[in-house]
């Protein structure tokens, strides 16, 4: 077990001074906020965060606020500490701005980002994150506290094996959820038809 800051650089996201104004199309940057991340987690049964699924904004700030795809994003407030992996893709040309609601983790060469996301979401690590948070009404994770968190670092080969198994598991969950949704829609149609026949 080693401290998190020995295998990842950790910084906070960008502090927006005003309400974030999202645009449907025509933005020049993507934005990451907790509300959008939670919805993507729930809808997709995955902690992989495709950049193109994020809302767009018209960005007028500096370039140093941009976050590279391949980073791990960890919510820093509100008691929801599920990490996300910002999935790299060749088709995305716009930069990404992450709000200060998140801590941004950029792993070193000894840690695969997708594995870091996975291990942070495991029950033992989630308990450690909750215990490390401060505040009662609005729990917060501080970067300095997170840096001292102890984490297991298996070989890169083992990390890759875990990633591949987790991808299969997430895919199975997505297929199962889709089948259940289709079944639900079919039954709703049957119920409506039966009700019509009784009138």
Model-identified regions with their sequence ranges:
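Basic, amphipathic alpha-helical recognition segments used for DNA target recognition
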Residues: 4-8, 100-153
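Short, surface-exposed loop/turn microsegments at beta-strand edges and helix-strand junctions
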Residues: 21-29, 49-51, 65-67, 85-99
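A short beta-sheet element
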Residues: 76-118
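Non-catalytic DNA-recognition/assembly elements of restriction-modification systems
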Residues: 1-27, 153-199
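A structural connector/turn signal
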Residues: 61-62, 92, 136
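Sequence-specific dsDNA recognition surfaces
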Residues: 5-20, 37-69
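Generic structural signal for buried aliphatic residues
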Residues: 72-74
